[in-house]
Amino acid sequence: MLLNSVLLIAMQPMGKISEYRNQLAECPRWHPAENSLYWTDVSAEQLLRYHPDDGVEVVCDDVVVGGFTIQRDGSLLLFMDEGTVGHYRDGKVVKDILSLPEVNTRFNDVTADPDGRVLCGTMPGKDHPGHLYRLDTDGSFERLLTRVQVPNGLGFSCDFDRLYFTETNNQIIHAFEYDRETGKIANRRTFADFRQSSGKPDGIAVDTDGNVWSAQWGANSVVCLNTDGEQIDQIDVSAQYVTSITFGQPEQDRLYITTAQASEPNVDDSGRIFTAEPGSTGMDLRHSQIHV
């Protein structure tokens, strides 16, 4: 659906979790067992955590993490540069536990399905396109899509029969039929078309009403789309480059919003992590269950 107009239900007040600035914050994930928010700073090569009592801390340095999932045992599965997958537990990272056959590529956004598989995108390079893969629980990869222009936000409908997949540079969110039994996708269609908008769609989150919340890179905002792809709400953010979002807290009723710094550092609140109460609740966390 082409987004020519905007119907706003409400403008939500914003807050910041701290004054800490990231270079390129991505992939926020709420860890229920730890009552903490994790995210990655891709450019700074760091994995970070926020706890309401302790503030922000860097839990790991020297890791280029495009995205990650929370395993059912509470550890983190890290999707990294060079097409490799690592494992984080108790402050320690084990790198290269799994890898793609292709080289010179970096994983970007990822999401777990309800059966423990992981859908994961890889970035295009000068000599190769981006791809979308599925990582099965036995540690094997299957390529689902090729020639992808900057794969980004991934999410599922409430009944898990629809997969949402964002191509940022094409400014489109696609929808596919998803087969839970096999993990295969089919019948791609355009869910939302942002080519006449000022922003580019980035990370996404889905609420319990089936609405899709999309971070808007370059447009100082997060938009909410109903199940037909129509924009029904918007949250304004005091940072131009909004990268991703997730629901968190015990009731999944708080939205956490990551951003990146502009080319000129310390402009507005760029690079900070924001929080809002959107009046919606997020779907329960889906854990990965990859044998590592």
Where do the language-model regions lie?
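Beta-rich, blade/repeat-based domains predominating
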Residues: 19-34, 62-80, 101-118, 124-126, ...
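Hydrophobic/aromatic beta-strand positions that recur at structurally equivalent sites within the blades
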Residues: 40, 50, 87-89, 135, ...
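Short, solvent-exposed loop/turn segments at conserved positions within beta-propeller repeat blades
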Residues: 42-43, 125-129, 168-169, 217-218, ...
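A short loop-to-beta-strand structural motif that recurs across blades of beta-propeller domains
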Residues: 46-48, 84, 131-133, 172-174, ...
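Short loop/turn segments immediately following beta-strands, especially the blade-tip
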Residues: 176-183, 278-282
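Blade-level signature of beta-propeller repeat domains, shared across WD40, Kelch, NHL, RCC1
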Residues: 250-292
